[in-house]
């Protein structure tokens, strides 16, 4: 029979041995962390030397069509009206100019040309319209007196405006946990004004590629396709400097993509890499490239300089063409960036964006 004293004599050596092993084990872990270039912060969390922490996404490469309606309406230019005084310019210089975004008329939000028409034709006649617009990122107010157009029998401002943007590009990645996607690697801009319009509502689709216009010196090529004849893939929510963003709602589409580990910008080195893209809208293929150099000094979406070395892509498209923006760049089995621009004078070369920058949005 054991007495209390005997039990204590047995327990103490065991406790001491356990503490010794624990100290050695903890010390081993600390030494391992210290020698792998990481550090322990004072809050007890592991810092990874400014690299993107180990994250897995689904690799893109699909050519997708997109269409969205903007917040506010974009001014493209003046439109002469046929009034009782013949054809006239109703808008004075600098009152509203190409590239302005009209967001309110008479304190009412406007997002379509029809919104503006309704407000103008339901206010007292001959009363000036109060306009709130955005010019180069800054809001300003002005007034315009609508004119009665005899051809349409409606009051109008005398402006060409638009509120719909569409195009095609390449999907970069999908987050498997949230089903959020990113594509293009740069903002979508209106072709006439260069203005990037904010998204009110939009969608992305599978894109049917009809052909390829090859890039030649001085003239960038392009993928040519039908934008809205494909299957709806998801919702477009944001148009930002680092790409377009939204949510994939087509579950079958998500399941067709393979996972890949994200690499931080500090993992990129000059040398061989791959880009993934589709030239027919159906099959995603990997093509050889060479990363020439990187710029880590906040170069926007021109962080990476790359060169196409794959003869298949050079023969088929002449190099990088419009529609390939967003094509994932993979090096050493990790997603490190996306193609964003082509050199106009050399279609075999272009720029890319660090994947870190796309993920930060």
Predicted regions and their residues:
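Gram-positive cell-envelope targeting signals
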Residues: 1-57, 171, 354, 359-361
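PDZ/PDZ-like groove recognition
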Residues: 65-95
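Short, flexible surface segments
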Residues: 71, 98-99, 125, 269, ...
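PDZ domains, with a preference for the canonical peptide-binding region formed by the helix
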Residues: 104-138, 257, 346-348, 353-357
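Conserved PDZ fold ligand-binding element
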Residues: 91-113, 329-332, 336-337, 341
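A short glycine-leucine-enriched loop at secondary-structure breakpoints
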Residues: 87-101, 122-124, 319-323
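PDZ-domain C-terminal substructure recognizer with occasional recognition of PDZ-binding tails
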Residues: 64, 97, 117-157
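Serine endopeptidase catalytic core focused on the charge-relay Asp
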Residues: 148-318, 322, 331-332, 340, ...
């Amino acid at each position: 029979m054991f007495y209390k004293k005997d039990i204590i004599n047995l327990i103490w050596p065991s406790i001491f041995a356990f503490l010794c092993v624990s100290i050695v084990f903890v010390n081993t872990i600390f030494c391992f962390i210290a020698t792998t270039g990481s550090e322990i912060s004072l809050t007890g969390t592991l810092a990874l030397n400014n690299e993107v922490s180990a994250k897995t996404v689904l690799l893109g490469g699909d050519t997708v069509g997109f269409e969205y309606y903007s917040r506010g309406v974009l001014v493209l230019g003046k439109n002469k009206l046929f009034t009782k005084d013949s054809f006239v310019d109703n808008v004075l210089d600098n009152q509203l100019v190409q590239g302005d975004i009209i967001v309110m008329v008479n304190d009412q939000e406007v997002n379509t040309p029809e919104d503006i028409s309704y407000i103008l034709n339901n206010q007292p006649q001959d009363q000036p319209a109060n306009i709130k617009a955005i010019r180069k990122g800054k809001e300003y107010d002005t007034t315009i007196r609508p004119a009665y157009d005899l051809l349409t029998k409606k009051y109008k401002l005398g402006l060409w405006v638009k509120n719909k943007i569409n195009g095609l590009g390449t999907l970069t990645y999908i987050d498997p946990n949230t089903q959020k996607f990113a594509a293009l690697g740069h903002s979508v801009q209106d072709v006439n004004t260069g203005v990037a319009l904010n998204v009110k509502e939009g969608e992305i689709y599978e894109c049917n590629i009809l052909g390829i216009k090859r890039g030649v010196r001085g003239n960038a090529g392009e993928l040519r396709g039908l934008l809205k004849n494909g299957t709806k893939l998801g919702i477009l929510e944001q148009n930002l400097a680092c790409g377009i963003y939204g949510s994939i709602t087509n579950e079958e589409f998500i399941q067709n993509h393979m996972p890949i580990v994200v690499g931080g910008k500090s993992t990129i080195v000059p040398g061989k890499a791959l880009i993934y893209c589709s030239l027919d809208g159906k099959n995603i293929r990997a093509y050889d490239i060479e990363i020439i150099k990187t710029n880590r000094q906040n170069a926007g979406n021109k962080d990476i300089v790359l060169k196409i070395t794959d003869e298949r892509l050079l023969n088929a498209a002449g190099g990088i063409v419009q529609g390939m923006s967003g094509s994932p760049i993979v090096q050493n089995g990790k997603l490190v960036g996306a193609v964003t621009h082509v050199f106009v004078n050399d279609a075999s070369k272009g720029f890319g964006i660090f994947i870190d920058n796309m993920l930060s949005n």
